[in-house]
UniProtKB/Swiss-Prot annotation:
Belongs to the importin alpha family. This is Importin subunit alpha-7. SUPFAM superfamilies: ARM repeat (SSF48371). ARM repeats lie at residues 93-133, 136-175, 178-218, 220-259, 262-301, 304-344, 347-386, 390-429. PANTHER family: IMPORTIN ALPHA. Gene3D superfamilies: Importin-alpha, importin-beta-binding domain, Leucine-rich Repeat Variant. One of its GO terms (molecular function) is nuclear import signal receptor activity. The keyword Nucleus applies. It comes from Arabidopsis thaliana.
Length: 528
């Protein structure tokens, strides 16, 4: 498998690679289900609902539109509030198009500049917030009318309610796409946003600011790290608070900041957030557990030293809890992925996983869990086999990992088949040593000429599955299967054939009368 096309493709996503099939793996785009799931869509854009008893209108009629162009301040505030309320209610998609078609967006942007009317600024910012929460086309309208620069300026408003609403508006704009995010960053929004996270800020401001920060840090292509890493000190303070929503947004920001090079990972480590992240990985709320766990998972894709930092902070007992508990599929999958990157490390790190009693939980998931979870559990075990010592591999065999690995040889995921095949090959190699005279004293087992791991694979119906892979369309899988069969079973078949030949005999009484080309043996033996 080394040097093969399959592994070269897989390795392109690694942070580091160990010999064999294993290696630390960055999260692949097709693995990131939660980024496409509905529960995270709420992170990207949020529409603010109407306050109780807000003045409202039944529809956007011409009279209401004309009021927006009035010179009377009180009438402007009332009309803007009514339109904003329409944008908070039902039929949002219809209402936002009506507002845009009526040409009201540039008027709302103009109201943002009226510093002598903070109430009008607030209502206009709220209306723009909800417009930007719509489609990408809706967001583009807000951007195209110059709202971003003015919103960033309003982060310095003396009025808390205005600043908080502006933070929300910028969060919706930056959450639309990487291009919109970069426009907001390009207007130097981040430094002013970080100023909102002071000790006197209300919880609602902290929550909104953390959410907007997460949107400024997310997306592919990623934002310039030297720009967004300025948020790390603030995030390190926010993560020490207790509000569930605030913690979730803060952890998501850390997910995005830790997703990348070892230099990025090191910056997150140096922000002193890892111990708190590990504690949050067993939080009561899945909305906090998921991003906390994913950040930990990102960190252990780094080098051995960075991975060891997480181990030293006692992450493994938390991971055992997540693997054994009744958590949702996403959390169990994330936990397995995290462990797989730890078992891709050095042998002492593999041993730390063993000592934490994680292997039984992995084997259980490998046998009984859903496909995605099973795949990550397989990677965790196969990485340990790839980089483990013979003694460590023997330990995994005793944990009964062979049968579930054999069962995966028939799955449709060619990368996973290859990984399991390589793991079984390593197991067979260890079994060969085990059966040789050199094994005596190492495993303290009786000497035998039989490869016990080959027997276990046969009992698990693995031999017939490996034989079936000789017709696999993937050339690497085919070649590896053939090599395994030639190395560990062909010789056995030859020995059996020889034994059968040795069993052919003639009765002793008739031996002298055995016919030959020159007569019987007795005749050939008689002399003159």
């Amino acid at each position: 498998m080394k040097g093969g096309e399959t592994m070269s493709v897989r390795r392109s996503g690694y942070k580091a690679v160990v010999d064999g099939v294993g290696g630390r793996r960055r999260r692949e785009d097709d693995m990131v289900e939660i980024r496409k799931a509905k529960r995270e869509e709420s992170l990207l854009k949020k529409r603010r609902e109407a306050l109780p008893h807000s003045p409202s209108a039944d529809s956007l009629d011409q009279k209401l539109i004309s009021c927006i162009w009035s010179d009377e301040r009180d009438l402007l505030i009332e009309a803007t509030t009514q339109i904003r309320t329409l944008l908070c209610g039902e039929m949002f998609n219809v209402r936002v198009e009506e507002v845009i078609q009526a040409g009201l967006v540039p008027r709302f942007v103009e109201f943002l500049t009226w510093d002598d009317s903070p109430q009008l600024q607030f209502e206009a910012a709220w209306a723009l917030t909800n417009i930007a929460s719509g489609t990408s086309e809706n967001t583009e309208v807000v951007i195209d009318h110059g709202a971003v620069a003015i919103l960033v300026r309003l982060l310095n408003s003396p009025y808390d309610v205005v600043r908080e609403q502006v933070v929300w508006a910028l969060g919706n704009i930056s959450g639309d796409s990487p291009r919109c995010r970069d426009i907001v960053l390009g207007h130097a929004a981040l430094p002013s946003l970080l100023l909102q996270l002071n000790h006197g800020a209300k919880l609602s401001m902290l929550v909104n600011a953390a959410w907007t920060l997460s949107n400024l840090c997310r997306g592919k292509p990623q934002p310039p790290f030297d720009q967004v890493s300025a948020a790390l000190p603030a995030l390190a303070q926010l993560i020490r608070l207790d509000d569930k929503e605030l913690l979730a947004y803060t952890c998501w920001a850390l997910v995005y900041l830790s997703d990348g090079s070892n230099e990025k990972i090191q910056a997150v480590i140096e922000a002193n957030v890892c111990a708190r992240l590990i504690g949050l990985s067993i939080h009561r709320s899945p909305s906090v557990i998921t991003p906390a766990l994913r950040t930990i998972g990102n960190i252990v894709t780094g080098n051995d030293s960075q991975t060891q930092h997480i181990i030293d902070l006692q992450a493994l007992p938390c991971l055992v809890n997540l693997l054994r508990g009744s958590y949702n599929k996403t959390i169990r999958k994330e936990a397995c992925w995290t462990v797989s990157n730890i078992t891709a490390g050095c042998q002492s790190q593999i041993q730390a996983v063993f000592d934490a009693d994680i292997c039984p939980a992995l084997v259980n998931l490998l046998q009984n869990s859903e496909g995605d979870v099973k795949k990550e559990a397989a990677w965790a075990i196969c990485n340990a086999i790839a980089g483990g010592s013979y003694k460590q591999i023997m330990f995994l065999v005793k944990q009964e990992c062979i049968k579930p690995l054999c069962d995966l040889l028939t799955c449709s995921d060619t990368q996973l088949v290859m990984v399991c095949l390589e793991a079984l090959k390593k197991i067979l190699k260890v079994g060969e040593v085990f059966s040789s005279r050199h094994a005596e004293g190492i495993y303290q087992c009786p000497q035998t000429n039989v490869n016990p791991h080959a027997q276990l694979i046969e009992e698990a119906e693995g031999l017939e599955k490996i034989e079936g892979l000789q017709s696999h369309e993937n050339n690497d899988i085919y070649e590896t299967a053939v090599k395994i069969l030639e190395t560990y079973w062909m010789e056995e078949e030859e020995e059996e054939d020889q034994e059968q030949q040795d069993m052919i005999y003639f009765p002793v009484d008739n031996f002298a009368n055995m016919p030959t080309s020159s007569g019987t043996l007795s005749e050939m033996h008689c002399g003159p």
